[in-house]
Design a protein with these regions (language model features):
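Hydrophobic or amphipathic, alpha-helical segments that drive membrane association/targeting
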Residues: 1-11, 33-48
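Zn2+-dependent metallopeptidase catalytic core
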Residues: 11-32
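Surface-exposed helix-capping loop/turn segments at secondary-structure junctions
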Residues: 27-31, 94-96, 134-139
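Active-site scaffold of zinc-dependent metalloenzymes
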Residues: 42-74, 91
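Post-HEXXH active-site segment of zinc metalloproteases
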Residues: 74, 90-121
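Active-site recognition of the HExxH zinc-binding catalytic motif
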Residues: 78-90
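Long, well-structured alpha-helical subdomains associated
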Residues: 113, 127-139
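Short, conserved alpha-helix that lines the donor NDP-sugar binding/gating region
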Residues: 124
Length: 139
């Protein structure tokens, strides 16, 4: 079961939900998860979006995606898929936060630069694949 909440401004609720539902039905069909997508200006932060756990670090099931509200349609879709990939990584247990330490597949990766973080490398690679897959299936 999937529960989606959306909020913020300058976004399409219908489009946002369609992307999240598509991903969850395809890649997380048997998981009970709750996802809140908050649309807001992220200019000062210098990011398109990010994902955080809302409940516990062990077997998380509640997530918050914050996404920049002034992205092009293509960048918006890719960013949603990028952040959904992080949710998948958390649910699989590949990506974990333990007492302030970020672990990838059980290895402490807290000191790695952004470009060296395996979970970001994977999400960056997958966002384009997911974007193209979604367009192919929904055109």
């Amino acid at each position: 079961m999937l529960t989606i909440y959306t909020s913020g401004y300058s976004y399409s609720h219908k489009h946002c939900c369609a992307l999240v539902i598509w991903f969850c039905e395809k890649y997380l069909p048997r998981h009970k998860i709750e996802i809140e997508v908050l649309h807001r200006g992220l200019v000062r932060e210098g990011v398109y979006g990010w994902c955080s756990i809302q409940d516990c670090d062990w077997r998380p099931r509640s997530f918050l995606i914050e996404i920049h509200n002034r992205l092009s349609k293509e960048d918006y879709m890719k960013t949603i898929f990028h952040e959904m990939q992080h949710i998948l990584q958390h649910i699989r247990g590949d990506l974990r936060d333990k007492r302030g330490i970020r672990c990838w597949k059980g290895i402490d990766c807290s000191d790695l630069e952004y470009s060296q973080q395996e979970w970001e490398i994977e999400a960056n690679q997958r966002e384009l694949d997911l974007y193209e897959e979604y367009l192919t299936e929904n055109s």
